[in-house]
């Protein structure tokens, strides 16, 4: 097992996730410390509270991080290390402390989406009026204050970027002249609106949009339309994937799968579904399937969420989940955050 104290996770030094009312230095479920101080995006990033979080990385404790949720810390137990980690040296510490601002900004300040996925929201959401004005205000702040040193944009950790009016317009009319250091635009989407016609209108981002994450969470029509992607159409997403997985400028794909009681039996089939698309791809690319634990973002009461946590050893279907996990955990291109279960069920895994 790799010792985390020998390495520095660079995310809290180079990444910020901006929500409409809060701000983070990593995925909120992986590093649950809100750094919003009313200082603006850049000011919050350099605030005393943000620096306190970074010190827990530098001292090797990672005490603010949730090691069960973070797939990158979880992978260390499997002797796998992500590129986000660098060796802890005086030179690297000095380098990280001198960063003028975030390299990566995650646009999570618009929750508009054409789906009402139960793990994410209780109903369909479309930002209008004052809500959209706030989105436009934050976009302006990013364009004017952060653009000069931003290398990566992430759209979006909270909405579907192709559905959000503000994000869609941003991608169509990207102010390239402001983002002189931009190298990558990562698209996180349910994929349903990512059509060739719309993509052709977004030519300004094509050279930057070289990675994406598609969240589908199902391998069957019933589960997709009735359990994990309310508002979705199975035939539509399969058709969209035929196009999306063949885009030559996309060099890295991630297919995420929020694992829960309603879909864990489809883990292996999900992997096969994804692999089949890349078996047909004309040009080589990198792809992965990421199995994550379901997280309660406030959409479940305590009793309901206990039923969702099939990976909890007290869950009546825990052993069945372990059997399904065994089928995929060693497959090529699979990433997951269930490594702690090896110690719980070592005889089965």
Predicted feature locations:
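Accessory C-terminal segments flanking Radical SAM cores
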Residues: 1-88, 104, 278, 290-349
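Leucine-rich repeat
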Residues: 58, 140-148, 171-178, 201-205, ...
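Short pre-active-site segment immediately N-terminal to redox-active cysteine/selenocysteine motifs
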Residues: 64, 69, 112-116, 124
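Short cysteine/histidine-rich metal-coordination sites, predominantly Zn2+-binding motifs
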Residues: 82-95, 133-138
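Core AdoMet radical
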Residues: 101-112, 123-137, 149-165, 177-195, ...
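Conserved C-terminal portion of the radical SAM core fold
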Residues: 152-154, 186, 207-213, 235-349
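Distinct, well-ordered alpha-helical segments
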Residues: 165-173, 196-204, 266-270
